[in-house]
Each structure stands twice: as structure tokens, then as C-alpha cells.
């Protein structure tokens, strides 16, 4: 039976998907009713899509953190809030590994597990569900995170307008250089024409087609027992990224921030973001039953 499962590509790895959302508020009393409304909307949208979803309890969230920080640990997660009250320990004491080591800037160690945090340099015009499916089909320990922050519509339009102005200014400078050098002023670098056209189309989409703009960060957390296994996993992950016109880049000297941004706390400590529109993002949200 095990041989049959391995032949089918199912070696016991489990795929789970979480959505974490957050808002800015002065205190938890102000935030709680807003979060509850957002939660109800999200669950209702999943129901419409035919996807089963449920909110996690505090203990379930702690178990996810425990399994993330202790991927090779054989001892199951043991926790109760009564034990916290009786022992005087905090919740961190129940989920932390024996050690964290961030030494060389490109990898880190959690107990006996070695890991590497990377980000996706998005060169393609859109993200597709096929790319995400290939990452999730990898026969490796892998955490994929998509941090998506919506921009206020007026701020997004203002941002794109400033980019259009910058490109037009660069065009004028290039035309002046061409005139001084005796060249045709209509001959300017092709990149400027390309970027200028894309920026104008984006502005039109935001103003007249009800598109929204989002700042997106895609992170990958590979973990393994040995350095060689980790290198193989990172190489395989990078190969899939290249297939879809993207590039996997290591978070040099930001491994700790990459790790903490890869757990489902809704916290993004990585300042590397790519602006994408609704149409560019919608393809990665195909509903699946898992």
C-alpha cells in the first residue's frame, strides 16, 4: 500500500491553507467587532465558492506555530491554558524550539532543523494558480506566504500618476540629450516607451475599470534535516519560479524577519513589495477543496 501511495506521489505530506487578516486599531476593544465582521464576510465568501473554512482557536494557532518551529520534532504538541496559569509560563514556552541560530545570513537553524527564507521577485505581469499549485505539489517541507495589502484607491491613483509624471520627465531628458547630440528627438530608449504605456494603462484601469491596487510580498520558507537537502529544496523551488517568469531570491541577512513573516500572524517584516491589480491577483485564488 505504501509503495502504491509513493507511486502516486503521496508520501504522507499534508497541505494546509490559512488566511490571516488584520486591521489597524487603537486597542483590541476597537478592533474586535471589526475583525468579527471581516471574518463573517470571508467565511460567507468561501461558502459561496463551495470551500469549507472555519476560524482557528487560540490553541490551534499555537499548534501551527509549534509545528512550524519544530518540524522534525517527534513529541506532539501539548498545551492547555490551565497549565499556563498553574506553571507561570507563557505561551511562547510551549512552542519555542530548543534554539534559534541566525549566523551566516543565508540560512538559519531551529533546533536540529536547518531552513532558508526567500522571496519571489515577480517579473511576470500576473500570478497564476498553476504556479502556486506546482509549489504546493513539491515533495518537500515548504511554507508559501502571500502578504497582500490593499491600497486606498485615491492613494493608488496618486502613486501611478506620479510614476507617469516621472516617466514623462525622463522622456523629456532623453529628447534633450538626443537634440544636443544631433539625433532624432523621437528616438528614445524602448524601455521608457514600454513603461510609459504600461503606467498609462494601469492608471486607466484604476480610474475607469474599477480595478484595485495591492502591494504583494511572496515568501518561501524551505526547511530540511541537512544542508544538502535544503540546497536541493531551494533549487527545486527556484526552478518552478523561473518556469513562470519569476525569480527566487534569498533574503540575505533577513532570515529572522523572513521566518517570522512566514508564520500565520499577519505580520510582514519584509519591505520588498510588488504592486499588482485585482486582475493580476485573481488567478491565484481559484477555489479548491483541501
Question: For each of these PLM feature ranges, what is it?
Answer:
Residues 280-290:
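Residue-level detector of conserved catalytic or cofactor/ligand-binding positions
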Amino acid at each position: 500500500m505504501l509503495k502504491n501511495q509513493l507511486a502516486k506521489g503521496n508520501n504522507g505530506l499534508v497541505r494546509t491553507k490559512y488566511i490571516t487578516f488584520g486591521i489597524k486599531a487603537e486597542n483590541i476593544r476597537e478592533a474586535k467587532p471589526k475583525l468579527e465582521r471581516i471574518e463573517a464576510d470571508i467565511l460567507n465568501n468561501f461558502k459561496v465558492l463551495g470551500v469549507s473554512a472555519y476560524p482557528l482557536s487560540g490553541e490551534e494557532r499555537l499548534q501551527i506555530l509549534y509545528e512550524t518551529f519544530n518540524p522534525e520534532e517527534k513529541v506532539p504538541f501539548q498545551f492547555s491554558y490551565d497549565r499556563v496559569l498553574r506553571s507561570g509560563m507563557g505561551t511562547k514556552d510551549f512552542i519555542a524550539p530548543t534554539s534559534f541560530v541566525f549566523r551566516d545570513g543565508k540560512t538559519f537553524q531551529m533546533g536540529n532543523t536547518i531552513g532558508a527564507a526567500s522571496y519571489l521577485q515577480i517579473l511576470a505581469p500576473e500570478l497564476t494558480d498553476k504556479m502556486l499549485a506546482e509549489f504546493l505539489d513539491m515533495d518537500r517541507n515548504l511554507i508559501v506566504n502571500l502578504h497582500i495589502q490593499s491600497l486606498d484607491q485615491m492613494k493608488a491613483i496618486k502613486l501611478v500618476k506620479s510614476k507617469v509624471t516621472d516617466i514623462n520627465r525622463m522622456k523629456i531628458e532623453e529628447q534633450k540629450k538626443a537634440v544636443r547630440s544631433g539625433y532624432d528627438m523621437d528616438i528614445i530608449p524602448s524601455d521608457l516607451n514600454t513603461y510609459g504605456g504600461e503606467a498609462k494603462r494601469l492608471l486607466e484601469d484604476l480610474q475607469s475599470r474599477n480595478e484595485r491596487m495591492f502591494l504583494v510580498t511572496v515568501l518561501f520558507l524551505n526547511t530540511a534535516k541537512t544542508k544538502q537537502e535544503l540546497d536541493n529544496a531551494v533549487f527545486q523551488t527556484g526552478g518552478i519560479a523561473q518556469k513562470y517568469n519569476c525569480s527566487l531570491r534569498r533574503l540575505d541577512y533577513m532570515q529572522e524577519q523572513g521566518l517570522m513573516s512566514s508564520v500565520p500572524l499577519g505580520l510582514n517584516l519584509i519591505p520588498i513589495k510588488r504592486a499588482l491589480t485585482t486582475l493580476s491577483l485573481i488567478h491565484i485564488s481559484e477555489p479548491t477543496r483541501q
